[in-house]
């Protein structure tokens, strides 16, 4: 059975942040919930798989392991297929949106007067060596803080009115047959309150943007696509609560070294005479020079592995390997002297230098018999 990719299952990209993952999960879970698809076994299995995907992708540690090693890497980390342990709160809110259950508790839990997320995600660009060995990086970004005149409401003098669309309930209801469905009010976003006159200071946004900069230690071994959390550097709510800042790592490719997880690959050009004679050559590594023993008769694209010469695992799993792939190169042109020397060398091998003749001779005879 083909393993289902969690990102494909939720129909999101691998660089999606937590809010995108949660939004996709809620949409897919509502679509395939068994109570909306009675008797549909396929929808039920899809619903279980969606929950399994969310349990992994909503957990930073599990997500990092999954991104590197796939589903197999989660074995031994408490992951079980089809479970619900990772999303009871989200499942509860889905029930509320589908059937209108628990409206008052949801309103109490989610009701807020500001209209921005507390967590912030920005991209941090790293050179190849900065990601491999770690570095101290200066971060320049903007965060949001509640507008003081309106206290983050976006309303003039901070005064909000009862939302006319949902009458202060935070939800709107619709009927489909005998079922009644409740959804978050599109106007007030579930707060039950709406702006009549906008605050002049923030023009109704409810926040002000503040520039900030600081230095952060990037750990050794981070990779492209990883996220680093910096606590208490996100947006600030009117009550002083502050979110986190997430650094989305983007690593520039190196012109020679190619990284795959914690392993490093590069191609070493070898002249054909070195392959014929064998010998030792010096090759570059992440931390200096190494000696590579080229055996006589080595093949083009043959790989040689140096254990523990790769990238140090950011999760403490040791170091990856350095894999060198040789590329046999031949002269593009020969002068008269070189041509004469090669012809003499070929003649010195006798019939051994013409393996095609002995191979093809038997094939020619076989083909002739087919038509005789």
UniProtKB/Swiss-Prot annotation:
A zinc finger (CR-type) spans 134-211. It is found in: Cytoplasm. CXXCXGXG motif repeats lie at residues 147-154, 163-170, 185-192, 199-206. Residues 5-70 form the J domain. Pfam families: DnaJ, DnaJ_C, DnaJ_CXXCXGXG. The keyword Plastid does not apply. Binds 2 Zn(2+) ions per monomer. Zn(2+) 1 binds at residues 147, 150, 199, 202. Its main location: cytoplasm. GO terms for cellular component: cytoplasm. Zn(2+) 2 binds at residues 163, 166, 185, 188. Keywords: Chaperone, Cytoplasm, DNA replication, Metal-binding, Repeat, Stress response, Zinc, Zinc-finger. Gene3D superfamilies: DnaJ domain, Heat shock protein DnaJ, cysteine-rich domain, Urease metallochaperone UreE, N-terminal domain. One of its GO terms (molecular function) is unfolded protein binding. Its cofactor is Zn(2+). The J domain is necessary and sufficient to stimulate DnaK ATPase activity. Zinc center 1 plays an important role in the autonomous, DnaK-independent chaperone activity of DnaJ. Zinc center 2 is essential for interaction with DnaK and for DnaJ activity. Belongs to the DnaJ family. NCBIfam families: DnaJ_bact, PRK10767.1. Participates actively in the response to hyperosmotic and heat shock by preventing the aggregation of stress-denatured proteins and by disaggregating proteins, also in an autonomous, DnaK-independent fashion. Unfolded proteins bind initially to DnaJ; upon interaction with the DnaJ-bound protein, DnaK hydrolyzes its bound ATP, resulting in the formation of a stable complex. GrpE releases ADP from DnaK; ATP binding to DnaK triggers the release of the substrate protein, thus completing the reaction cycle. This is Chaperone protein DnaJ. It comes from Aliarcobacter butzleri (strain RM4018) (Arcobacter butzleri). The gene is dnaJ.
């Amino acid at each position: 059975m083909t393993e289902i990719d969690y990102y494909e299952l939720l129909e999101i990209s691998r660089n999606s942040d937590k809010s995108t993952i949660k939004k996709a999960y809620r949409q897919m879970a509502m679509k395939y919930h068994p109570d909306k698809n009675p008797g549909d076994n396929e929808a039920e299995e899809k619903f279980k798989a969606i929950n399994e995907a969310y349990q992994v992708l909503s957990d930073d540690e599990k997500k990092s392991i999954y991104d590197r090693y796939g589903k197999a890497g989660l074995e031994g980390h408490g992951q079980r297929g089809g479970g619900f342990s990772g999303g009871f709160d989200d499942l509860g809110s889905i029930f509320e949106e589908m059937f209108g259950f628990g409206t008052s508790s949801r309103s109490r839990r989610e009701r807020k007067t500001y209209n921005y997320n507390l967590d912030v995600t920005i991209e941090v660009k790293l050179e190849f060596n900065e990601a491999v060995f770690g570095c101290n990086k200066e971060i320049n970004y903007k965060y949001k803080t509640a507008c003081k005149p309106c206290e983050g409401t976006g309303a003039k003098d901070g005064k909000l009115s009862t939302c006319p669309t949902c009458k202060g309930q935070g939800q709107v209801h619709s009927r489909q047959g005998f079922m009644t469905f409740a959804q978050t009010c599109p106007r007030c976003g579930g707060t039950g309150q709406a702006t009549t006159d906008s605050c002049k200071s923030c023009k109704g946004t409810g926040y002000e943007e503040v520039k900030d900069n600081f230095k952060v230690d990037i750990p050794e071994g981070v990779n492209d696509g990883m996220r680093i959390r910096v606590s208490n550097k996100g947006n600030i709510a009117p009550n002083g609560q502050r979110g986190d800042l997430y650094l989305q790592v983007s690593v520039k490719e190196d012109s020679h070294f190619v990284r795959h997880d914690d392993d490093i690959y590069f191609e070493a050009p070898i002249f054909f005479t070195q392959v014929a004679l064998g010998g030792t050559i010096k090759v570059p590594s992440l931390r200096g020079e190494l000696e590579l023993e080229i055996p006589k008769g080595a093949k083009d694209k043959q790989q040689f592995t140096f254990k523990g010469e790769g990238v140090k695992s950011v999760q403490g799993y040791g170091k990856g390997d350095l894999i060198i792939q040789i590329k046999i190169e031949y002269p593009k042109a020969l002068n008269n002297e070189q041509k004469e020397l090669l012809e003499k060398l070929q003649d010195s091998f006798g019939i051994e230098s013409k393996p095609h003749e002995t191979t093809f001779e038997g094939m020619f005879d076989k083909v002739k018999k087919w038509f005789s």
